[in-house]
């Protein structure tokens, strides 16, 4: 205390050796906060903590020696109050900490006992050496506080580990309880399934007994009728007919598991009605063919009479050569039939006669069909001689005969051809739709593999200016699956030039392979051959002058006659094509086009294979 002689008088506490600057602080400390001398390690920390703030307060006035004491009375009191308040809070906090730590001191592992003992033993020697030194007591208080903080952190870690272990145990217990609940749920479901299986087994036994009873009854009309309806022999039907489609529908229904007697009975009734209609239709055709055969002798007699009259007229004029008018009259008389004939019995069509040359001998041409009534046969040409590059009359135009299609896919039910003209590789925008044709089985003849369809349509193209850039463009559209259920889908196309470089019609029987889409009318024949073919589909048509349309109308259309058609040659090689046909001698001139009557009565679109004739289509023009 002698070292503080220059400082204001400090009042020590007689119990805990703490010093104060005023008697009020000392009295308050003695009454409320004094805890006496530290007798154990637990109370030493509290006593040291109490002495922390007074030491700081005692050190502060050392920096202000020589300052009068009277002016510092009011600030000293405020500082003392704040220091007292902080000291009180710290003491209370330390006391509560000690009370909370006492139950856990005995549970701390022995691992920590050594450091605690050593750490507690260290500050006793300086305290015993300098009990009254404030700096030593402050340092001891700091060490004790740091040690307590470390101990509390260790205890908190131990508590945290123990809490985690308890959490794991709780989770294990919860999982065990959840597994038991799931096991109970599974057992309940198994019991329910076993009960359901028992009920199902009972129902099956009852059903089996009922089936055995029904099988045991010999004269059960219901079962016999159902078996008869289900397993009755299927009526045979020609492919491509309505009865065949109904039969396919019945087979598909049975294949999919259908066993309804009512539905099967209706299908069977529809098949019977369709077969009856097909039979009636075939009988009607045979009757019509028989009537036509009966009229044939009458027509032949009328033709012979006309030929005799022509011969008499020739004899009245003398042996002079016949003129162009007589030749035209003779051609008309031989071409115009006087009734409907069966197409296979008609004579082969002939081309219009050509005028004779002066001094030209009359040789007998092979292949002509005449009655040999004194008439020279060189005036009539066979059909093959007519088809080839020929002079063209723009006023009369040309005619296109669409005969049939071969190599169609099996999934196509109906087909339709859309035609149009193109000039200089650009479509004119006018298209014509041919009547839809039913796909039929292939004929027993060589040709493309696949079904066929008979088009049997003709289309006049009047007043068409000749040009090598004019071409015919055809697009094939098909129906698949159920017919007429949706719009047809385009599948292929083809293009054909109508004139050569000399502006002659490329008349002939042409066989055109259909090409894959997209459609491009600007392609030449060489470029068109580079496009892949659409399967094996091919179009068979005839291109003739308008003056030859009447003859070609009488030609029969048979899908088996593929050998009569040829592939179109390049435009530059038309001379070789022309050389393959029989051409007249020098001096022959193509006769002027004769006035043709409209052939509106030629329409015959019988279904099935066999001879057909072309039907009319509206004319095409630019």
Curated annotation (Swiss-Prot):
InterPro entries in the cross-refs: CCDC17
Stretches with biased composition (Pro residues): 344-356
Superkingdom of the source species: Eukaryota
UniProt keyword terms in alphabetical order: Coiled coil
Coiled coil: 81-102, 146-207, 294-320
Residue ranges, compositional bias (Basic and acidic residues): 593-615
Region listing for Disordered, in residue ranges: 334-356, 584-622
Full protein name: Coiled-coil domain-containing protein 17
Taxonomic classification: Eukaryota, Metazoa, Chordata, Craniata, Vertebrata
């Amino acid at each position: 205390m002698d070292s503080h002689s220059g400082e204001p008088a400090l009042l020590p506490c007689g119990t805990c050796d703490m010093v104060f600057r005023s008697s009020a602080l000392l009295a308050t400390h003695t009454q409320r906060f004094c805890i006496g001398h530290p007798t154990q390690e637990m109370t030493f920390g509290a006593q040291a903590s109490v002495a922390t703030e007074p030491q700081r307060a005692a050190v502060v006035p050392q920096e202000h020696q020589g300052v009068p004491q009277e002016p510092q009375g009011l600030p000293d009191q405020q500082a003392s109050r704040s220091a007292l308040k902080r000291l009180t809070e710290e003491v209370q906090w330390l006391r509560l900490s000690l009370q909370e730590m006492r139950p856990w001191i005995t549970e701390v592992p022995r691992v920590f006992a050594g450091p605690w003992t050593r750490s507690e033993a260290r500050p006793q020697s300086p305290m015993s050496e300098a009990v009254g030194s404030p700096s030593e007591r402050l340092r001891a208080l700091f060490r004790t506080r740091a040690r307590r903080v470390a101990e509390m952190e260790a205890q908190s870690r131990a508590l945290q580990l123990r809490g985690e272990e308890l959490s794991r145990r709780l989770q294990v217990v919860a999982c065990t309880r959840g597994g038991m609940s799931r096991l109970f749920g599974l057992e309940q479901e198994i019991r329910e399934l076993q009960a359901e299986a028992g009920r199902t087994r009972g129902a099956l036994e009852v059903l089996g007994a009922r089936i055995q009873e029904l099988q045991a009854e010999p004269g059960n009309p219901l079962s016999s009728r159902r078996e008869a309806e289900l397993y009755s022999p299927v009526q045979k039907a020609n492919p491509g007919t309505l009865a065949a489609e109904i039969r396919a529908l019945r087979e598909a229904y049975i294949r999919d598991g259908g066993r309804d007697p009512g539905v099967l009975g209706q299908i069977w009734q529809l098949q019977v009605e369709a077969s009856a209609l097909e039979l009636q239709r075939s009988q009607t055709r045979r009757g019509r063919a028989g009537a036509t055969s009966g009229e044939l002798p009458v027509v032949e007699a009328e033709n012979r009479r006309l030929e005799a009259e022509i011969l008499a007229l020739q004899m009245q004029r003398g042996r002079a050569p016949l003129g162009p008018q007589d030749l035209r009259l003779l051609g008309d008389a031989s071409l115009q039939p006087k009734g409907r004939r069966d197409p296979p019995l008609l004579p082969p069509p002939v081309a219009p006669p050509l005028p004779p040359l002066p001094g030209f001998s009359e040789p007998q041409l092979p292949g002509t069909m005449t009655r040999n009534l004194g008439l020279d046969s060189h005036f009539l040409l066979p059909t093959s001689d007519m088809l080839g590059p020929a002079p063209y009359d723009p006023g009369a135009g040309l005619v296109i005969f669409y005969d049939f299609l071969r190599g169609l896919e099996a999934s196509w039910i109906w087909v339709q051809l859309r035609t149009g003209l193109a000039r200089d590789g650009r479509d004119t925008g006018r298209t014509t739709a041919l009547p839809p044709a039913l796909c039929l089985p292939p004929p027993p003849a060589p040709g493309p593999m696949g079904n066929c369809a008979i088009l049997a349509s003709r289309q006049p193209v009047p007043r068409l200016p000749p040009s090598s850039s004019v071409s015919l463009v055809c697009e094939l559209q098909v129906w698949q699956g159920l017919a007429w259920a949706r719009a047809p889908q385009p599948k292929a196309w083809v293009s054909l030039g109508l004139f050569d470089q000399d502006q002659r019609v490329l008349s002939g029987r042409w066989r055109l392979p259909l090409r894959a889409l997209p459609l491009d009318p600007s392609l030449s024949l060489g470029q068109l051959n580079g496009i892949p073919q659409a399967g094996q589909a091919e179009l068979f048509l005839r291109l003739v002058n308008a003056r030859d349309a009447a003859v070609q109308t009488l030609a029969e259309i048979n899908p088996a006659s593929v050998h009569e058609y040829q592939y179109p040659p390049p435009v530059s090689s038309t001379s070789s094509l022309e050389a393959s046909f029989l051409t007249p001698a020098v001096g022959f001139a193509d006769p002027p086009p004769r006035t043709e009557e409209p052939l509106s009565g030629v329409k015959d679109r019988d279904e099935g294979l066999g001879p057909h004739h072309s039907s009319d289509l509206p004319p095409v023009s630019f």
